[in-house]
Amino acid sequence: MKKGKMIQDIKTNTSWPVLISTLFYIFLASFFIEGGLWIGSELVGPFSLVIGFLVEFFSPGNGTASIQEFFYHYFLYYELFSFVIILLLFMFWVKVIEKNALSSLGFVKRNWLKYLGWGIMISLVQMGVIALVYQVSGIGSFELNELSLEPILFILGLFPFWLLQGGTEEVATRGWLLTRIAARTNLPFAIAISSSLFGILHMGNEGVTFLSVLNIILDGVLAGLLFIYTDSIWLVVAQHGTWNYVQGNLLGFQVSGTGADASIFRFTMGDGPDWLTGGAFGAEGSIITTLVLLVSLVIVYRLGERKERVDNEQVCHD
């Protein structure tokens, strides 16, 4: 692996020892993530008052019932959208404090649409394989829900919000943390640290197990490789957001221990230990997901190394 232009152009603006700067980067990333989530939760109150007033004012009939119905159906939208606060914190830090370009987070125009498409396809294949193994082996089963137009539109509308949520986590752990550590050290170390923090941040989720944290870390390593090889944030934004969306709102899994409301399929868990079924954490807690991620890692690593060899040969010929 070699550092791309994105990492090479980063101004770290520090003479701190590597250990101190690494610990600072970990602290700041954690602070922005947890702080952003806290701000988002604190804004629920004022937000609900404003929306509640509008719903009551414009809705005929029982206003209270309308407010309750509104939040029952649409709170997930707000919950996912609140991640924009974390995104803005990192953007402010990069532009105002670091005085780096937003491209140092991976926001580059080159091939952005193609990378979004590839990220979506990767997650569809990964989750498709996991669901197929569940269904065929009896680990779990999927039945198509009978849905009216309203819940279908609700589900379809969630996709860009999952992209925002998953993309923000990628900006935090890959776009910012990985690149800043890599700028002062090396890529394997930066990938290991950012992926480990990614796993640790999920340890408070419902149904968490050792295997579920391991899978989150493996997914972080995979995202790190995809991020480095593309030198862009867009593929991992799409891969992460689609991964969560397909799990929760298409297949009916828990998403890292959290329910995702309406789904196209209804998932029924079969008998078996949590390490096989995933338990309350969802598919991310299953050994099946571990195997899929390991295979994905091998494929991406080999493709990435081949791409770098081709690039090096072209440079030599030039």
Where are these regions (language model features)?
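Hydrophobic alpha-helical membrane-insertion segments
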Residues: Y25-E42, F81-S82, W118-Q126, I233-F253
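Membrane-interface helix caps and helix-loop-helix hairpins in membrane proteins
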Residues: G140-N145, L201-F210
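Membrane-interface helix/loop boundary segments of multi-pass membrane proteins
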Residues: T12, T168-I193, L225-S232
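Hydrophobic alpha-helical transmembrane segments
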Residues: Q68-I85, P160-T168, P273-L294
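Small-polar-interrupted transmembrane alpha-helices in polytopic inner-membrane proteins
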Residues: I130, W162, N186-M203, I216-I217
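C-terminal membrane module of polytopic membrane proteins
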Residues: Y245-D318
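Functionally important transmembrane alpha-helices
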Residues: G35, S212-D274
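Juxtamembrane helix-loop-helix connectors linking adjacent transmembrane helices
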Residues: G36-F75, E79, E98-T168, L178-A183, ...
